[in-house]
Amino acid sequence: ISADGVCVSPWKPFIGASRAVVIDNKGQKHNVEALMGANGIYDIVKFQIQSSTTPAALATNVTANSNAWIVTTSKSYPPAKAMVTKVEKFMEKYNYSVLTTDVDDKLNGAIVANDKGQVIGLYSSNNSIKSATDAAFARDFVISGLSQNDLTLRECAIRVALPASVEEATIALMLSADKSESYRDGAIKEFLGKFPTLNDGYLANANLLITKN
């Protein structure tokens, strides 16, 4: 959903994972570097990979009785047609699209696009309910300095990304001190990359090196 490697996908495959790899439509593998927010109710997560990506265009408007296409990166599954039968709003501005399609839960997490190729959301088949959750919902996730304590994100061992502001990022860096060595190392490297002139990152790195020795 961005040119700098920010992605969205279903959350359930991340639960209990200590690492994750995504495969793009060219077959290239990318390690998930950090989580940027998740919602268990709508089964969606936002995360960062280290790669330049071509962002997908997100649909801003979805209407009932319109065509949709369920698309994957796998050559084994050609685009499958669907129909948007109903559109419900949640949190006032995001679309939850109810679909009619023959596609089963094997393609859960696939892109659902309109006739213009714009992304309506991520596909979900749960018993008799087939739907698409607005990808813009995950796009708008914002992490804070305390996001490491979020109950949903704690279901996954992958590191939580640092917030954009220096104040919140400093809090997150401090909280990472009691995490695993790899978690701390990732947080420190991200902090130094974002704020190379601040001493906090170098002090945290020095403390990490001491504990290694």
Describe the role of every protein-language-model region:
Residues 2-42, 136-137:
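Catalytic-histidine neighborhood of serine endopeptidases
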Residues 193-203:
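Short solvent-exposed coil/turn linkers within tandem alpha-helical repeat scaffolds
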Residues 1, 5, 9, 45-47, ...:
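Terminal peptide-recognition signature
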